[in-house]
């Protein structure tokens, strides 16, 4: 396709690291993004996307920094050039730790507030490419396509997002029994040179900033749903692909002084519509195959690698949350209060559990017969199962610690521009440990983290991004070592009888 070729020309060659500036330039490629009743002209110039795009571009520059070369890259086995470590297939525990250090560097640069940075879907495709025989069950050409696409993304530092959940139209019915067969994204035509996709899919976070969209389905599909049992990669600027972001929280004239997080890190969750989108065969990984559509997630380490990155990001976010709570207590003078110390201890325990579980599913990872390292499924899914509950409790504690501090602040940063107003603020809103401007800035950030639309979206995101909690708990149940547990019960039941003690 001419569109695909044009997109590729804007990217870095495999002999060099892709820069943030190159990423930003590549976004001006005719992609169809619709917001507030009109098509967005240039993503990088629109106030809803501009700053988030710059934050992602900064991540590419971090990865390309010469002083971080060892931490952020490994040598491509195909080109010999440095490439993002996110694309490394881990074969040793040291490899998996190195991938964590890569993701932590990006997560720390965004304070854990951007969940779909380029390393996330990279984890999934790394897992797919690690076990291509799963895709070969539908035909060897599909396995070859997966590996080629993985190598292209790896060697050209490409950014893929994904849409893997069908729209919530009528979940009581399978895909093929919806009122219109083209509601869910599926195949509507097969051609000699590829297939045509029509329908909708969600939830493509950060798709507006990406090079490719991976369309697949992680929901269980039933017999009769074959037209929806596909996996493909589509350029974001492909004709017929339309992105509908939710209402952006970063808006025009929004001050970063008042909304320091919203203004920078709003990722843009997108609803995707495929209006007869053509996909050439070389970008098709699964075609009308229910079994492979299911197995791609569970018989490859893709789901584990992608969520390993997600837990790196989440553990980093919790450290940021702990820092916010600590600074807030300092600003309010409550840091030495014994009751506050108890609540902070509870927060610290939760943050430590997540970080410890992250390291545990690395150290308990196992190597399969092909030499591929698989993170511990039980450990990973256990922390994911706890996350929705722990995160809510942590936010509740910070709200309790804050009291009225977050809502007794000046109306905006412009209040400091008026000498009379500023004089009152400087006098009455100071802290015992900081001046008024520092106190207000700190508490504004806490409010942006907790109380704004941005904060509410994050609370919802952490609750559901890994799937509904009951599904995650089913995964824990599926992978728990019941054999070892029940063997102990059987051993206890088989203990020899003990003669009753005689009374003296």
Model-derived regions, located:
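Short, charged, amphipathic alpha-helical segments
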Residues: 341-345, 373-381
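Charged/polar positions within long, soluble alpha-helices
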Residues: 165, 330, 356-363, 392-399, ...
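Acidic/polar, glycine-rich intrinsically disordered N-terminal extensions of enzymes
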Residues: 1-76
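Extended amphipathic alpha-helical segments enriched in small hydrophobics
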Residues: 309-367
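Alpha-helix capping/hinge segments and adjacent helical runs
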Residues: 378-504
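Generic structural signal for well-ordered, non-transmembrane alpha-helical segments
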Residues: 50, 54, 151-154, 196, ...
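FAD-binding core of flavoproteins
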Residues: 167-313, 477-504
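Glycine-rich flavin
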Residues: 74-212, 217-231, 237, 242
């Amino acid at each position: 396709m001419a569109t695909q070729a044009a997109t590729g020309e804007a990217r870095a060659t495999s002999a060099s690291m892709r820069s943030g500036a190159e990423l930003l330039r590549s976004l001006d490629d005719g992609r169809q993004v619709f917001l507030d009743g009109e098509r967005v002209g240039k993503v990088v110039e629109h106030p809803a996307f501009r700053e988030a795009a710059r934050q992602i571009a900064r991540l590419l520059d971090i990865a390309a920094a010469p002083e971080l070369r060892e931490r952020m890259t490994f040598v491509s086995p195909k080109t010999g050039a440095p490439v993002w470590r996110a694309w490394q297939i881990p074969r040793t525990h040291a490899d998996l730790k190195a991938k964590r250090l890569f993701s932590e560097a990006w997560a720390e640069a965004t304070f854990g507030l951007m969940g779909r940075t380029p390393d996330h879907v990279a984890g999934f495709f790394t897992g797919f490419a690690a076990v291509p025989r799963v895709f070969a069950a539908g035909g060897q050409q599909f396995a070859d396509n997966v590996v080629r696409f993985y190598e292209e993304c790896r060697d050209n530092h490409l950014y893929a997002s994904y849409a893997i959940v069908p729209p919530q139209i009528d979940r009581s019915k399978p895909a093929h029994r919806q009122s219109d067969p083209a509601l869910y994204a599926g195949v509507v035509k097969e051609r000699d040179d590829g297939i045509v996709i029509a329908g909708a899919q969600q939830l493509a976070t950060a798709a507006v900033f990406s090079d490719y969209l991976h369309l697949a389905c992680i929901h269980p599909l039933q017999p009769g749903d074959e037209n929806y049992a596909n996996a493909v990669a589509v350029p974001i600027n492909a004709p017929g692909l339309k992105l509908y972001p939710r209402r952006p929280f970063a808006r025009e004239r929004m001050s970063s002084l008042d909304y320091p997080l919203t203004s920078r890190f709003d990722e843009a969750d997108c609803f995707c519509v495929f209006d007869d989108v053509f996909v050439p065969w070389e970008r098709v990984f699964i075609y009308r195959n229910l079994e492979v559509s299911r197995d791609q997630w569970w018989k490859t380490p893709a789901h584990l690698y992608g969520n390993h990155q997600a837990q790196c990001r989440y553990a980093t976010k919790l450290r940021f949350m702990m820092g916010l709570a600590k600074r807030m207590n300092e600003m309010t003078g409550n840091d030495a209060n014994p009751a506050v110390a108890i609540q902070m201890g509870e927060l610290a325990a939760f943050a430590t559990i997540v970080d410890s579980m992250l390291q545990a599913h690395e150290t308990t990872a196992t190597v399969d017969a092909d030499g591929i390292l698989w993170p511990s499924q039980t450990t990973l899914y256990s922390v994911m199962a706890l996350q929705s509950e722990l995160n809510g409790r942590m936010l509740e504690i910070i709200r309790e610690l804050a009291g009225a501090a977050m809502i007794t602040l000046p109306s905006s940063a412009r209040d400091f521009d008026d000498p009379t107003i500023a004089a009152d603020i400087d006098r009455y809103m100071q802290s015992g440990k900081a001046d008024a401007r520092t106190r207000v800035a700190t508490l504004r950030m806490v409010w942006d983290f907790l109380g704004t639309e941005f904060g509410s979206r994050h609370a919802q995101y952490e609750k559901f991004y890994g799937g509904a909690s009951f599904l995650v708990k089913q995964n824990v149940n599926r992978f728990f070592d019941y054999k070892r547990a029940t063997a102990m019960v059987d051993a206890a039941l088989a203990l020899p009888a003990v003669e009753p003690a005689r009374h003296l």
